[in-house]
């Protein structure tokens, strides 16, 4: 009976872990999309210092700010990307990308942003 219980619990753990690993974003893929669609404002390294940033008021968010980024859940970050800044009380200059990005692209971008802030 003990062996059966250990086997069942082991299987449940592996299944749960595998499912979350498959759902996680790919930070390398996120970095590719970031470079194409985000770096002009947020900068190559995420500091909010992209070539367009000088003319933007408010300035783009510094995505390397670990204190700020740690205070946001992955869902919070995805919501800003999906709905745009104006809808969530952030900069109205941040576009809503939910209509053009897949769930996987959102997950990939969140993974890349977590890599930028090391949080």
Where are these regions (language model features)?
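Bacterial N-terminal signal peptides
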Residues: 8-16
């Amino acid at each position: 009976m003990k062996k059966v219980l250990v086997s069942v619990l082991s299987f449940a753990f592996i299944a749960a872990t595998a499912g979350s690993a498959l759902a996680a974003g790919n930070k390398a893929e996120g970095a590719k999309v970031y470079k194409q669609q985000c770096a002009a404002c947020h900068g190559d390294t995420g500091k909010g210092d992209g070539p367009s940033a000088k003319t933007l008021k408010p300035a783009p968010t510094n995505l390397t700010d670990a204190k700020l980024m740690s205070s946001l859940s992955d869902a919070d970050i995805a919501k800003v990307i999906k709905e745009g800044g104006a809808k969530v009380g952030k900069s109205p200059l941040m576009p809503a990308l939910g209509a053009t990005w897949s769930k996987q692209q959102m997950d990939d971008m969140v993974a890349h942003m977590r890599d930028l802030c090391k949080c």
